[in-house]
Amino acid sequence: MTAIRYEFIKTCKQTGARLGRVHTPHGSFDTPTFMPVGTLATVKTMSPEELKAMDSGIILSNTYHLWLRPGHEIIREAGGLHKFMNWDRAILTDSGGFQVFSLSDFRRIEEEGVHFRNHLNGDKLFLSPEKAMEIQNALGSDIMMAFDECPPFPATFEYMKKSVERTSRWAERCLKAHERPQDQGLFGIVQGGEFEELRRQSAKDLVSMDFPGYAVGGLSVGEPKDIMNRVLEFTTPLLPDNKPRYLMGVGSPDSLIDGAIRGIDMFDCVLPTRIARNGTCMTSEGRLVVKNAKFARDFGPLDPNCDCYTCKNYSRAYIRHLMKCDETFGIRLTSYHNLHFLLNLMEQVRQAIREDRLGDFREEFFEQYGFNKPNAKNF
């Protein structure tokens, strides 16, 4: 019995998006879904109870950051990440690869792994497929990710080809080193940049290894949205229908809908909590920056069409006041709202798939949110 099982429910006749359910050792969640990011074993400013109140079935934590602080051995001693952070639903941990490539000024890639400097204190560190598995096995997440190379955008075909080949070899080493396949599902990560030939090669390599799920990596790294959509169009059909598909690092509302239309089941991104900290809110009528002076006497909710805790209880004027005074409660309220907005958006996406009208929903949402306007903002 594998730790992770994907249950297919139906396909949207209008778009081909799929409705499903992922079963894990810590419960099930419906897909397509958005996963809030709890980098350091906490979704910034949110309690586990609040995440449950907004119906989050799975969150993401970060292997690299937890390895550095507090250390995976301490989390193992605590009884694993679920106990450590008091979260009894599913957890996905990334492999640490993206952080090694994005945070460290100094890094040297070898066949064995990656040498780099700790971004906190400059110490020399080494992360390999085996080490990434050891850390994630200690954390005890339900879904763990293979250690991959995260190439920059843009990269040459030659560089990307070598990178894909290395990522495939590393994936094989991850499978061998993974010590808890019965209660932790390991996902392979398809790379290859914008090159269809390399995506095909990467998918073929990984599918032959029979992972319980697959991620599409190397997107949302600065490439235009049309390139991301094009890559998804030729990549997701290469992945098995009976396994979950995860698009890493994507969280803007338009990309969530467009990803679901292209067959993606799972998404994660720090976007909702990151922008909340500077007062930027996603609403049914588009982006709203609550710090702006025009909201000083606005006693209506952030979003008149939202029924979240923030919108039911607090006004734009009050939240603006908190943000201007650097009060933590202001960040909690905007973070709660943004997370609720995306989780609720995914429920609307699932309902549209049930009704075979996701294409129509996309048009309506884009029109209302303002994505169809010239110079539309990303979120």
Swiss-Prot record:
Region of interest (RNA binding), ranges: 249-255, 273-277
Gene3D superfamilies tied to this protein: Queuine tRNA-ribosyltransferase-like (3.20.20.105)
Domain of life: Bacteria
Assigned protein family: Belongs to the queuine tRNA-ribosyltransferase family.
Gene encoding the protein: tgt
Coiled coil: none
Protein's UniProt keywords contain Metal-binding: yes
Entry keyword Zinc: yes
Listed Pfam families: TGT
A molecular function GO annotation: tRNA-guanosine(34) queuine transglycosylase activity
Residues holding substrate: D94, S95, G96, G97, F98, D148, Q191, G218
PANTHER family, A to Z: QUEUINE TRNA-RIBOSYLTRANSFERASE (PTHR46499:SF1)
Top-tier EC class: transferase
Protein name from the UniProt record: Queuine tRNA-ribosyltransferase
Catalytic function, reaction form: 7-aminomethyl-7-carbaguanine + guanosine(34) in tRNA = 7-aminomethyl-7-carbaguanosine(34) in tRNA + guanine
Residues where Zn(2+) binds: C306, C308, C311, H337
